[in-house]
Amino acid sequence: PWTDRPSNRPDYTLDAAYADALAVRALRVARGERPLGYKVGFTNRGIWATYNVFAPIWGTVWDRSVVFCEGEGVLRLDHTCEPRIEPEAVFGFRATPAPAATMADLFDALDWVAPGFEIVQSHLPGWKFAAPDTVADGGLHARLLVGPAAAHLDLTDNPDSILRALGNPVGGGGGAGAGGGGRGGG
């Protein structure tokens, strides 16, 4: 656990936090870890006020933090801080979308979709943080369990099939409190 919030410093902005996150990413790559993609957190506006976060954030997903499984899977929670579990829709991209991509462009870049569970963590006790803290904390990512993938082309004819592929009954909703997740593009 951290003993102090980075955001307690008045000059610690989201830009500063993302710069720190990129510096940590470079150190992890230098020691042999491989980024697999990104997770997007706080996609549910309904929880923003609770966590003092007012926009989605992103963090890197690493080869050492992801487990792919076709059935049952096991994740170790050693060395995590105050872990929580969140259901996720995990997206694999065959190409990195352009920065100004349209929804159609994003769908064209998509390769597969899979159900998943993310273990999120907070290094700040009690999950008390501001947006820059979550970015500095790797987007709160700890582990990701990715279930069986459905090819994107199998899903294009019927949008309801996306929900079925993710294990949700059509019209059944989803993870209302989930922080969001994603993988791909590395």
Predicted region positions:
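Glycine-rich phosphate/ribose-binding loops and adjacent secondary-structure elements
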Residues: 186
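Catalytic-core "active-site belt" of small-molecule-metabolizing enzymes
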Residues: 1-183
